[in-house]
Amino acid sequence: MKILIVGDQHRTDKRPKNRTDDYYATLIRKTLWQFDFAMRNSCECIIFPGDVFDTYKTPFNVVREMIRLTRKCEDGVIGIKCLYTFGQHDVRYHTTDVNNTPLGVLLAGTSGELLGSEPFIFDNNGKPVHVYGAGWGEDVPEPIDNEACNIIATHRMVIGDNPLWEGQTDYVTAKDLLQDTRYALWACGDNHQRVIASTLRHKHVVNMGSMMRSTIAQFGHTPAVCLYDTDTRRISIHDIPHAPFENVFKADEIAEKVETDTRIQDFVESLKSVDTSVTDFPKALAAYMQTNDIPDNVVTIINKITNMEKYHG
């Protein structure tokens, strides 16, 4: 059987400040494309690994429209099952109760299921597929049948080889998850950038990133979905049709980011001349910044991540 794994949806009708297009219309179009892709590829279910909505305050009209679109997908010729975990954006005040939330209303208005420690089971012609869930802050459950194709949908920060920012601690690497032999597939959410990792024995960690690009920081992100075949245990990645980044974001903001990234790269390259063996490296670095022509925006960023303001002056 085939399963579609999507990224964080962050459904909302609010346009991010640097977007220039009709954001909600784009969100609807991508949502429809995902459902259509699942139907065209005979998927039996779609896994939504958390942050289905952008906030628990999502307007009723958005929730109502998502119920309508989801029902059309569920009631089609194939009858696709939508399976969900919750992210921190889906719940009120960081609790685990989704009942009085947009996600809870979506579940009540459709045949969707909230995944948990008890598996949602597909027979798959005698080759059972068990799908579990671990929402934001929840522990990963123990599978009840090691002979089944066990899949876990989870909302946690999964990264590649390196932290996303200096000092990041609350994460797990995709390689670490691949060492966990309990699950054939980890369908993850939370990280808005794509992370894919696989073994030669066809174990996979899939984090598709966000469906929508909401910030300039996602300059290099390509929205996509993952198609998983439980029989072959193979995955394939498919890009969601989307406009070029410069067509939907403010041009001056893009130019500023590119310029800042370039200056930071130049600064990092210039740091090779700083003696890293000195006892007080932060002080030496601050002195270097004061005696060299370092752009103000680069200085600001360095100060934020190193807390070096105290060395200035």
Where do the PLM segments sit?
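Conserved catalytic scaffold of divalent metal-dependent phosphoesterases
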Residues: 66, 83-176
